[in-house]
Amino acid sequence: FDVNDEVASPYGYRIVTNYCISGRREDDKGVERQMTALEIMRPLLETDRKTDLTPQDIFSLLSRSYKNSFTGLDYVRDYRKLVSKKTGIAVDQDFIPRRSTSCSVVFHGVRPGSNPLSTVMWTVLGYPACAAAFPLMVGETDILPDYVKPDAAGHSQLCDIAMDLKSENVFKWNVSNGSHYMDMESV
């Protein structure tokens, strides 16, 4: 995707959730999540506010959002009204971060005329609500910190920590349909 292509990206940005706009239409997935992302970002990106947005803002607004535009629910905004009064438990359905989410990426591009190799790829490795963002220079090679590199089992230490936090604190019920519920008190 090219954000400089005015036909593909008329506003100079591109918001994509996996499987929402590629492949066969009958296989579309993530459409609700993309609707939410566009609803959150469009007002910001179509004003002067877009120049103030940082990758961290985008992670907070999108990757860590518990809003569902399809249903109108926003667990962050309306937490006290929406979750179970006794337990803080909420049903996980069509939020941008899914139970299976293991990474979120924001590319921080450069201004026209600047070296494109100065682009920074900000990465949240692991479940976004339980993980930290770190920068990687696109134009560099062999720069991955050891805690990001895969170990002998193919796992990143940083990702494993975030995924452990997710299973211990957010999706902590593994019986019956328990995996479809999240503990919003921990989020």
What are the residue ranges of the model-derived segments?
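C-terminus-biased signal that marks the final domain/tail of proteins
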Residues: 1-187
